[in-house]
Amino acid sequence: MGPAGSLLGSGQMQITLWGSLAAVAIFFVITFLIFLCSSCDREKKPRQHSGDHENLMNVPSDKEMFSRSVTSLATDAPASSEQNGALTNGDILSEDSTLTCMQHYEEVQTSASDLLDSQDSTGKPKCHQSRELPRIPPESAVDTMLTARSVDGDQGLGMEGPYEVLKDSSSQENMVEDCLYETVKEIKEVAAAAHLEKGHSGKAKSTSASKELPGPQTEGKAEFAEYASVDRNKKCRQSVNVESILGNSCDPEEEAPPPVPVKLLDENENLQEKEGGEAEESATDTTSETNKRFSSLSYKSREEDPTLTEEEISAMYSSVNKPGQLVNKSGQSLTVPESTYTSIQGDPQRSPSSCNDLYATVKDFEKTPNSTLPPAGRPSEEPEPDYEAIQTLNREEEKATLGTNGHHGLVPKENDYESISDLQQGRDITRL
């Protein structure tokens, strides 16, 4: 029993060892498979996301969709997300959906005339649309009335389409501006028509005619008739006529400009002092008349005055009348005494010792204190003693020069810049 028990014990030990090894191996295999599966899942998920991202990038944005022209036939039509529903993260566009989008945009890419034909008379599209076109909200009661009539079935003004509404509103604003300017014209016309009965009657007729409207228009636009009653053509014609009438009526009332005075150029106008007998006065009168005639003729031609002679015409251009010589009509020269012009008195005679006023000599300095004293015989009530002192200075210098000339002869004029010897000689002369 001993060896048999030992064999059983050794067999159990081997079985447990092999079982534990097999369990460990199976555990490692299972963990390895799990790792592989997880790696496969990680690789598959980015590939799926990248495919969705590429599909989303291929779809054009809303900006590209609106920037593409509807009438261009050469561009490829993008897939519309609004027509086919919103795109989700996992959806992939199939070929059937792209074909339907292509067909839809091929139908849309038509000419402008086909688009206009697709709308009925009320402005509503014939084909069914998934979304409605944007409409401008009514800003006034006039717009609400127009929209209400279009819904009821009446065809309103400018309701052919959504874009025509914009045109109608802009034209209506222009009409309002025209009304503002034309009211100013009407005020001017009323002020002018108070003086002109004809213009007033014509204005009344034009305004009454402009306010008349056809039956359906007056019924539909009774509340805002002030905008519809403006007839710009009639108003323009009326304003032009009134302005022409006012211009014709105001022309005779305007005063004519004053005539330009003709100035007769006479060289002998300033000859006021006349010396001589009656013969000289008559001679000057005749010469002044001839000069006036010549000066007045200088503005005329032979066409204006056919009585002109050749001498007078030549005198206009070639003769120069000097103040000392006057010409008669016959051509004789008359001498006028020159005493009429006052001659300028010459400078008082200077002393021989003073050559220049800028540089004073020794003689001048020595004589100024003695000469500035007023003489005894001169009256003391003279108003300007300074000027009189200068005159007495000149007189005393002349007397001194005459005395020195009588005794010592003429004294030579001194230079502006004197030497020492000349200065000493000058002192000796002044002492004598």
Swiss-Prot record:
Keywords: Adaptive immunity, Cell membrane, Immunity, Lipoprotein, Membrane, Palmitate, Phosphoprotein, Signal-anchor, Transmembrane, Transmembrane helix
Membrane topology designation: Single-pass type III membrane protein
Composition bias type Polar residues, residue spans: 110-122, 316-356
Record's comment on post-translational modification: Palmitoylated.
Bias kind Basic and acidic residues: ranges: 220-230
UniProt-reported outcome of changing residue 181 to F: No effect on interaction with FYN or CSK
Disordered: annotated span: 110-137, 197-230, 244-432
Keyword Iron: no
Outcome following mutation: residue 105 to F: No effect on interaction with FYN or CSK
Reported tissue expression: Ubiquitously expressed. Present in germinal center B-cells, plasma cells, T-cells, monocytes and platelets (at protein level).
Source superkingdom: Eukaryota
Effect annotated for changing residue 299 to F: No effect on interaction with FYN or CSK
Main localization (coarse): membrane
Keyword Translocase tagged: no
Covalently attached lipid (S-palmitoyl cysteine), positions: 37, 40
Subunit structure: Interacts with FYN. When phosphorylated, interacts with CSK. Interacts with NHERF1/EBP50. In resting T-cells, part of a PAG1-NHERF1-MSN complex which is disrupted upon TCR activation. Interacts with LYN on plasma membrane lipid rafts. Identified in a complex with LYN and STAT3.
The protein's name in its UniProt record: Phosphoprotein associated with glycosphingolipid-enriched microdomains 1
Protein species of origin: Homo sapiens
Gene: PAG1
